[in-house]
Amino acid sequence: MAKKQKKLDDITKKFGDEREKALNDALKLIEKDFGKGSIMRLGERAEQKVQVMSSGSLALDIALGAGGYPKGRIIEIYGPESSGKTTVALHAVAQAQKEGGIAAFIDAEHALDPSYAAALGVNIDELLLSQPDSGEQGLEIAGKLIDSGAVDLVVVDSVAALVPRAEIDGDIGDSHVGLQARMMSQAMRKLGASINKTKTIAIFINQLREKVGVMFGNPETTPGGRALKFYASVRLDVRGNTQIKGTGDQKDTNVGKETKIKVVKNKVAPPFKEAMVEIMYGEGISRTGELVKIATDLDIIQKAGAWYSYNGEKIGQGSENAKKFLADHPEIFDEIDHKVRVHFGLIEKDEAVKSLDKTEEAAPVVEEVTLDLDDAIEIED
């Protein structure tokens, strides 16, 4: 019985060795034909953690789970009219430029306001802007920018405004069933691999439409077919909620609105998380407002009555004064922001310690030098 088992083990080992050799030969052949790195074991990849770029909003970074938009992926931002979709995308543009990257904006709606973009922190002198005449042209321009590998972020505003050339050349009332969906499906097939290879973030803004004859369930849908839904790694549903009233002389004036951003699809972290942000008219997302709220919930900022305090020192009476204090003291803002990100695991503790060490190393060293001027100095000829 033992001999039979040993013989069986020898056959299995021999068969396993042959399979291993055949696999190695196949891997060598693939690398020879398609280049090194065309196939590899997943554990051999230099980067296994998903690289991300901050969305420009702390609350949204937390909701996304990974700490921002994943690089080399497609993002879809959709919602009702005037809900803040373009504002969310422009904050991503500003963040990309802040990190030293290059951003492009495909304005298919021909409605980008440069002054508003500048107010959100976008460097409009460096922003690449295209206002295409047709959907095919807009997607072709986006494809060439992505293929170059030199652009970090491409925003398309919006999918609904990417009108196929055949529809533009035709008459109003002509039927073009599925034309835009086919165009988007082909674009996703062409752009998907290039986006991942170049680590470009592609943000597609989309509108909402109503399905006809839906009696049960959600009648809302997004134009452009199903391809974008499948290819997108992250889908964000942006909805405006209650209006925000001003203070003092503006107490009866709407100065902004609370906006809920729901992550309805997420391939890099758990989905269905929500972020509540304050979008102030003419200013964009209130970064100080969301930081005060989140840090207070975590007791990083302490609240007693109407007073807010940090590290035992009062920073303002009422949330508006606390926001103003953080806006006037960017170093304290960054310190609190860092603590919040560490708490939610957006920054590893080791990285946090390293960054603090770098700060200490960068601090100027002041040495006291005492000169004794009582002694005479003799100079020999």
Curated annotation (Swiss-Prot):
InterPro entries: AAA+_ATPase, DNA_recomb/repair_RecA, DNA_recomb/repair_RecA_CS, P-loop_NTPase, RecA-like_C, RecA-like_N, RecA_ATP-bd, RecA_C_sf. GO terms for cellular component: cytosol. Keywords: ATP-binding, Cytoplasm, DNA damage, DNA recombination, DNA repair, DNA-binding, Nucleotide-binding, SOS response. ATP binds at residues 79-86. GO terms for molecular function: ATP binding; ATP hydrolysis activity; ATP-dependent DNA damage sensor activity; damaged DNA binding; single-stranded DNA binding. Its main location: cytoplasm. It is found in: Cytoplasm. One of its GO terms (biological process) is DNA recombination. CDD domains: RecA. PROSITE patterns: RECA_1, RECA_2, RECA_3. NCBIfam families: tigrfam_recA (TIGR02012). Belongs to the RecA family. This is Protein RecA.
